[in-house]
């Protein structure tokens, strides 16, 4: 399976798993987002309990190719607390919906995290020295009587154990009536967007009390509502361009230079529906759960319930590539509707060179598709393969008929085990995959 480096066949092997082994999972421990920073040295996860955990790549292991995929806890902090909206009598969950890193400009790191209503800018900084020798303070912290001070001394910095501090620098609140589903930092690194079901707002990172509404699809009469915004993202190179996807399977590309309110899109990406596949579930499964620009900015990838599509920004009428993630579930849509799995929101990601796309599935399976060779692979995040450098065996699902020895029947898939969140290191073949409450890290096998 090709990875960040290009067309060579890659064997993926187990590196680490984070999180408790218990079958009885606390709701607060369920991972809700996973994101590498721009260098890939840090990996952040958010959970339903409002916590953010940051892992750091082991520095000494970066040189040893077989241990590059080892990450250890760097910082843990409570990003959001549960709140109550007294005006609407609604509980606001603390669950972290999205995390986005800002590019590093100095020794500190910055990230944005959001729950349903409030976005926060966090500063993550290290301290390994502390000042000592104050004139009015004893070494044990007691204050001295100023009249007893006969000589002035210059405080000095003394080494101390490394301490990582997370401090909230900005809180962006009270701008969304509906639940925030996306945040995306602009390529100017000064502004970012936040999207909820019906509106998209543009913020400046320095200004918390004001945002600009750039998309508003709320109808005058809510009974006429036919679609909602499901995801939004800024173009990686063009700071005036962004896209947003809808529950009807369309993607709109907007140019902020055209007008202040981008209600009229510049481009509309939509694939005509195949009449032979039309069913009661067509509209539900065509809803887009994630949209991601390629690093180059030439393509974008969308994920709907059954497939991943890659679109060329210069061609609106159909995707240039379509990859079936779990087509064998088409015959199971009725039962997936009854158990609400049909509404699961799977995310997708690109590798560093845009040559491979990855997304999750059920039974703790995840899928990779090589855009050059058109080969695909299904792998499993499981504790059975948890010896370091154990090579992952490809898995196959048997849709019907006779099942071969290594195949899994579609009827025996566990729909409670699902991989919704995945992330790919921006420069190396290291991937992070979130199962319910565990974070798996895999890397390519180096001979």
Swiss-Prot record:
Q: Where are the WD repeats?
A: 11-80, 94-174, 175-218, 227-270, 288-325, 347-381, 414-446
- Entry's Gene Ontology cellular component terms: cytosol; glutamatergic synapse; protein phosphatase type 2A complex; synapse
State the Gene Ontology BP annotations: protein dephosphorylation; regulation of chromosome segregation; response to morphine
**Could you tell me which residues carry N-acetylalanine?**
2
**Keywords tagged on the record:** Acetylation, Repeat, WD repeat
Q: InterPro entries per the record?
A: PP2A_PR55, PP2A_PR55_CS, WD40/YVTN_repeat-like_dom_sf, WD40_repeat_dom_sf, WD40_rpt
Coiled coil spans: none
Tissue specificity remark: Brain.
Which GO terms fall under molecular function for this chain's record?
enzyme-substrate adaptor activity; protein phosphatase 2A binding; protein phosphatase regulator activity; protein-containing complex binding; tau protein binding
Tell me which SMART domains the record gives.
Answer: WD40
The record's disulfide annotation reads none
- Domain of life, per UniProt, equals Eukaryota
- Summary of subunit composition and partner proteins: PP2A consists of a common heterodimeric core enzyme, composed of a 36 kDa catalytic subunit (subunit C) and a 65 kDa constant regulatory subunit (PR65 or subunit A), that associates with a variety of regulatory subunits. Proteins that associate with the core dimer include three families of regulatory subunits B (the R2/B/PR55/B55, R3/B''/PR72/PR130/PR59 and R5/B'/B56 families), the 48 kDa variable regulatory subunit, viral proteins, and cell signaling molecules. Interacts with the PP2A C catalytic subunit PPP2CA. Interacts with the PP2A A subunit PPP2R1A.
What job does this protein perform? Substrate-recognition subunit of protein phosphatase 2A (PP2A) that plays a key role in cell cycle by controlling mitosis entry and exit. Involved in chromosome clustering during late mitosis by mediating dephosphorylation of MKI67. Essential for serine/threonine-protein phosphatase 2A-mediated dephosphorylation of WEE1, preventing its ubiquitin-mediated proteolysis, increasing WEE1 protein levels, and promoting the G2/M checkpoint.
User: What's noted about domains in the record?
Assistant: Has an extended WD 2 repeat that is important for the interaction with PPP2R1A.
**Family per record:** Belongs to the phosphatase 2A regulatory subunit B family.
Name this protein carries in UniProt: Serine/threonine-protein phosphatase 2A 55 kDa regulatory subunit B alpha isoform
| Gene designation per UniProt | Ppp2r2a
């Amino acid at each position: 399976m090709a990875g960040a480096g290009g067309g060579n066949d890659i064997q993926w092997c187990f590196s680490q798993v984070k999180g408790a082994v218990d079958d009885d999972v606390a709701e607060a421990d369920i991972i809700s987002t996973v994101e590498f920073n721009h260098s890939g040295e840090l990996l952040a996860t958010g959970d339903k309990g409002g916590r953010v955990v940051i892992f750091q790549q082991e520095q000494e292991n970066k040189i040893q190719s077989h241990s590059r995929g080892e990450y250890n806890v760097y910082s843990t902090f409570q990003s959001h607390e549960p709140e109550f909206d007294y005006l609407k009598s609604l509980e606001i969950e603390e669950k972290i919906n999205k995390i986005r890193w800002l590019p590093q400009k100095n020794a500190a790191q910055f990230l944005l995290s959001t729950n349903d209503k409030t976005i926060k800018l966090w500063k993550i900084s290290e301290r390994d020295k502390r000042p000592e020798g104050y004139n009015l303070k004893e070494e044990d912290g007691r204050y001295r009587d100023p009249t007893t001070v006969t000589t002035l001394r210059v405080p000095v910095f003394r080494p101390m154990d490394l301490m990582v501090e997370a401090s909230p620098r900005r809180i962006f609140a009270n701008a969304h009536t509906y639940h925030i589903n996306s945040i995306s930092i602009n390529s100017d690194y000064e502004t970012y967007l936040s999207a909820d079901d019906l509106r998209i707002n543009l913020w400046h990172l320095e200004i918390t009390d004001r945002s600009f509404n750039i998309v508003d699809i709320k109808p005058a009469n809510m009974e006429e509502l036919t679609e909602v915004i499901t995801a939004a993202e800024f173009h990686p190179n063009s700071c005036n361009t962004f896209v947003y996807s809808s529950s009807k399977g369309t993607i709109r590309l907007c140019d902020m230079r055209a007008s202040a309110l981008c209600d009229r899109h510049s481009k509309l990406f939509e694939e005509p529906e195949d009449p032979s596949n039309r069913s009661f579930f067509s509209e539900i499964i065509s809803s887009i759960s994630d949209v991601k620009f390629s690093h180059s900015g030439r393509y974008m990838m969308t994920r709907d319930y059954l497939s991943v599509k890659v679109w060329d920004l210069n061609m609106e009428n159909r995707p240039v590539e379509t990859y079936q993630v779990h087509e064998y579930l088409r015959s199971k849509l009725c039962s997936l509707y009854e158990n609400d799995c049909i509404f699961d929101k799977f995310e997708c990601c690109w590798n560093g060179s845009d040559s491979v796309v990855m997304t999750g599935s059920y039974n703790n399976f995840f899928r990779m598709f090589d855009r050059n060779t058109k080969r695909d692979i299904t792998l499993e995040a499981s504790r059975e393969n948890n010896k370091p450098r154990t090579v992952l065996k490809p898995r196959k699902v048997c849709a019907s008929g006779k099942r071969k020895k290594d195949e899994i029947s579609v009827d025996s898939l566990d729909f409670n085990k699902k991989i919704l969140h995945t992330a790919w290191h921006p420069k190396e073949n290291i991937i992070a995959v979130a199962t319910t409450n565990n974070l798996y890290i895999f890397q390519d096998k180096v001979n």
